[in-house]
């Protein structure tokens, strides 16, 4: 997040994560409060230099993709997004696995409804679902925002799609990525 140290400390204490993924900027903030979170595993992304006690994300990727076989209660928390905190400290909004799954289904239904409505209004034949290509989404919003996760990452992952991440918004870079990656879906802030 874009939190300053005291906000970061509050969010970490409130959510009790096991692993913290952070880039250079957030890592620098975290290192000032790290002693309060001694058991927190820290993974660095886009780091300029290695840091003691911080695992580089490239090393994580080398370990392979095997995940443990676990049982998930659909009503357990899947993620926590924090509000902006306009009336005090940010509040953790918890999303369940069931809620995230329903969101994916609702987005799929809404997308198909919009497509079929557009085809009908324009006297076009709907495309054959067998010809559908996986989503290729350009993510221009921060991953700590619900829009990037629920509206892009979840449906793209569920459909076998591709996410192309922009670290910071740059219109020229976005155009290059759209062309090079053949982006089919873009969501951004007006």
Residue ranges: model-predicted function:
Residues 78-118:
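Conserved AMP-binding A3 loop
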Residues 101-140, 144-185:
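Conserved AMP-binding/adenylation subdomain of ANL enzymes
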Residues 9, 69, 172-175:
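Short hydrophobic/charged patches on amphipathic alpha-helices used for structural packing
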Residues 25-77, 89, 101:
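ANL superfamily adenylate-forming
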Residues 15-16, 37, 180-181:
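Active-site charged/polar residues at nucleotide-handling catalytic sites that mediate phosphoryl
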Residues 64-82, 89, 119, 126-136:
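Conserved pre-ATP/AMP-binding loop-to-beta segment of ANL
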Residues 22-31, 46-50, 141, 167-172, ...:
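Adenylate-forming
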